Amino acid sequence: MTHIDLLPQDDSTNGWNNMLPPRNPNPPLTDTVSPDWVVVGAGFAGLAAARRLAENRPQDQIILLEAQNLAGAASGRNAGFAIDLPHGQQLQDELSVMPRHIRLARSAIDYLQQQIDTHSIECQWSSRGQYHGAVSAHAFRTEIEPFARVLDQLGEPYRLLDRPQLAAEIGTSYSPGALYAPGAFLMNPAALVRGLGDSQPENVTIYENSPVITANYGGKITLTTPNGRVRAQQLILGTGIYTEEFGFYKRSLLPIALSA
């Protein structure tokens, strides 16, 4: 039996969540249930897995366990944008693989757009694009201009802005210049996670405030929470950095927290 000792804790600092109206969470698990599938973690990964399972296997029952309230963890407190272009480490890849990155990112954005439209999810979803600003003239030459050349090779639209142009558009003259790409979307991620959770198919049952405290991977998957138990044939973990607690990827995951 695997004991899960490190559990998510809500520090009540999620501004995205705090600006939303109060929501009545789903009740915690207080019984023994035996679904076909159990999904742990109601972030983007767990919510997407539960939804697709339910759509592809409408005869199956799916339980989704969330340790906190919906949108309390990482998926509900990110920077609030969905990017369609290669960025960061992806820019070190071969040019030939970048169209694949773009297709994957845009298919994910299209899927989110479909869910938002279908279920009338109010999350301030908007097509605003993204500004890639430089902190210095040197950074503009070494980061922004090479990025622009990559986009030229990919045939992707963009605009380069100098300091006055950037100040006129976004109100700051801090950066000497920036690159604007039109394909990114902005949203309130906590509202998006709430909406994706509250619009799950009928054969998905979400239990909030139901952290898994033990896991047994015998003939059947058996998970216990403080007040209940799940026995299931199949298990999907959408647990992010907590996956090590479930006995997987030991000494392979490095938690990182960013703020701006």
Predicted regions and their residues:
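Central beta-strand plus flanking loop segment that forms part of the substrate or channel wall
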Residues: 82, 86-90, 128-133, 251-260
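Glycine-rich active-site loop/strand segments that organize a redox cofactor
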Residues: 73-104
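Helical element adjacent to the flavin cofactor pocket in flavoenzyme catalytic cores
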Residues: 142, 149-152, 173-233, 238
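Extreme N-terminal leader/targeting segments of oxidoreductases
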Residues: 1-37, 55-61, 87
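Glycine-rich FAD pyrophosphate-binding loop
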Residues: 54-77
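Glycine-rich Rossmann-fold phosphate-binding loop(s) that bind the pyrophosphate
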Residues: 41-47, 67
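Central helical "cap/lid" subdomain
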Residues: 228-260
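Flavin (FAD/FMN) cofactor-binding and adjacent substrate-gating region
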Residues: 2-11, 18, 88-89, 114-192
